Amino acid sequence: MIFLFNQSPLTTKKLDTLLKVAPAGTPILLYEDGVLSAKQGTAVSAQVTEAVKNHPIYAVTPDLDARGIKSIIPGIQLVDYDGFVGLVEKENPIPWI
């Protein structure tokens, strides 16, 4: 399974809930506004830095670029759209809404 997260951590606390309930080792894919969670120096940076220790976390590069995010939390893996599709095909995707 892979959790798909596309919401801004600036407008919702759903990332907090996801990180609490996701079983250790379960991948998390950040896309659309969800990539804001990957940015260093935000209110959720410490939480995401800890989460990287227990989960493979991916961020979609074109979504980071579209939002001008250059500095991401170490350990977050970058994927392009083909990588996004590959992860979703490989894992059972669960959208986090």
Annotate each PLM feature.
Residues 2-14, 34-38:
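Short, glycine-rich nucleotide/cofactor-binding loops
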Residues 20-36:
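Short, flexible N-terminal segments of the mature chain
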Residues 27-32, 55-62:
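Short internal beta-strands
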